[in-house]
Each structure stands twice: as C-alpha cells, then as structure tokens.
C-alpha cells in the first residue's frame, strides 16, 4: 500500500510537466499501468512540455520483486516499453513494439521513487525509434536504459484507442488535460 506521501509525489508534476492519460489507459487491465492495488506498479504519465517527450513517475511495489528486495528486470523493461510506446503515441504515431533492448544499470530497490523519460529519436517510414531511461526520482542514479523500434499501424486496428488518443492529445495541446 502506498503512503500518502508516495501518492502525493506520484501526482505532483515537476515544472514544465503536464499530466496526460495515454490512450491505452482506457483499458482496465493494462499490464503496466492497470494495477489499481499499488502492489505491482504505481505510475503517472506527464508530457515534458519543452520538447513534448514523455515523463512518468513510478513506484515499483512488492508485486514486481525479482531479487529479494529489488524489482525484477522484466518489470523495469515493461515500464520502459510502455513509456517508449507512449512517447511515440504522443507524437502522433499509433504504434506497436517490434524490437526492445533494455540495459540494466543498477538494482532497483522496491518502493523507490523513480522517473521514466522517453523520447522519439527517429522516424523512418513506418519505423519509429524511441529511447528511454529509468532513473532515481531524486537523483541521477540510472536503473535501466532502453531503445525500441515501434511499427506504425493503420489507426483502424486500434479501434477506440485511436479516437481516445486524438481527444487526449488535442485537449493536452489546448491545456485542458
């Protein structure tokens, strides 16, 4: 269970960050961001306004444990995957992952407050290359870094997610989200 301080930290954006709901969050059981119990992953997404990249605040709960007292590398890779995909969606690319590389830098203690940063690094036709970093929330300690190649799909394949994405990001651009 998260403390009141943890919940406040998750919800409070840094200067230049705007809260955002990613399109997949309309799904109740999203693997990464669909845990309402706080036992697995607790995270909130933000747009970094100066460069329109994605930021997230995340706390890895006891349900992410791998090595005793530390987050499983797969949970760290899953957070990077979702954040990097979200960064592509925020730039107008409805994508799915084709390739993901994660490099683990340090063990991540359970309950640590972390920040995820993700940004589109290149677009080549249907391929969208994205990079990301998972770091300590109040410092520079890197826990993981990653790169991914996402493939843009026909928006019709995403059904309601596409219209939700258009609504969310137009509201964000108008300052309402």
Predicted regions, residues:
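Hydrophobic core residues within well-ordered beta-strands of beta-rich domains
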Residues: 41, 52-54, 114, 128, ...
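Catalytic strand-loop segment that frames the active site of acyl-thioester-processing enzymes
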Residues: 25-71
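Short coil/loop residues immediately preceding or within conserved phosphate-binding loops
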Residues: 40, 97-99, 129
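Short beta-strand micro-motifs enriched in acidic
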Residues: 46-48, 119-123
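HotDog/MaoC-like acyl-thioester-processing domains
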Residues: 1-22, 108-110, 121-177
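Hydrophobic beta-strand-centered segment that forms part of the acyl-chain substrate-binding groove
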Residues: 1-2, 8, 82-115, 121
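Active-site helix/loop of acyl-thioester processing domains in fatty-acid/polyketide metabolism
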Residues: 53, 63, 70-95
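Residue-level recognition of well-ordered beta-strand positions that form the cores
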Residues: 57-59, 101-103, 117-119, 133, ...
